[in-house]
């Protein structure tokens, strides 16, 4: 069996430094995950990524500080007040410190993401960030993961100790969520204006999403010069109205991660490529960033994700070792 000739020509150009277009991104995503073309895509992305990032893998961590039934009602999120099984809970300072200490003890954590609810008060968010900033090593970056916010608030996040923020134009925005694309992009613009690093990815990917839909959102991360790009699949939640679609395989996620790598790898602003949730196929397809997790997790139905869907630092290190990475 021979690979598609148009595909092979594009792959050769990518290896020579070509930055792919939206149409080429869509083309690469159109191949079946079991195809020869998908296998080549993953292999070349892995090789390019290891060259550009010097074979370094980065460990990130996320603490889900709060959980509550959320009026945002994202159909893919376990916090949605339409179908959540969670009750309201917020970590106290001691619990936050313990989680932060566990993540940073080995000195191998590049950045710690602090996740709050969409409607957590902004003052509470600033308080969490400032307390953790004072607690953890100065070299460890802090990522803010919260709802939409203004340019003024972005400046306040930075002043409190945040180095970056995670924010995404999500698949199904405005249909599977109660938020508009304009709201999400306005917040991304606020992040960039404040000088915060933009953490971005294509998510939450389901089997129903088309190559055209994915390509549009993938390319938007490049338009905004994201610091980290990546790919995240939607996890099926039994009570979610999206459960009827099921979820993509890790093989398909790896293929999409590889295409994201092609899009982002030549950007001077890109620091790493993430795959969520962590898995070896993704790390062998261009990704070099994975997250350990504790506390609440919007892809989990357990109030403590660590030991359920979430990995700890040691598990992340073992996964990197199995995939032949050097941990930065």
Give a label for each model feature.
Residues 1-33, 222-328:
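Auxiliary Fe-S-binding modules of radical SAM enzymes
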Residues 2, 91, 124, 178-183, ...:
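Alpha-helix N-cap and loop-to-helix initiation/capping positions
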Residues 24-75, 79-87, 107:
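N-terminal [4Fe-4S]-dependent radical SAM core
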Residues 49, 53-62, 69-71, 75-80, ...:
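Mobile, glycine- and charge-enriched loop segments
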Residues 65, 81-98, 102-129, 133-188, ...:
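Core AdoMet radical
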Residues 111-114, 182-242, 257-271:
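Conserved C-terminal portion of the radical SAM core fold
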Residues 150-157, 207-221, 276-285:
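Catalytic cores of alpha/beta
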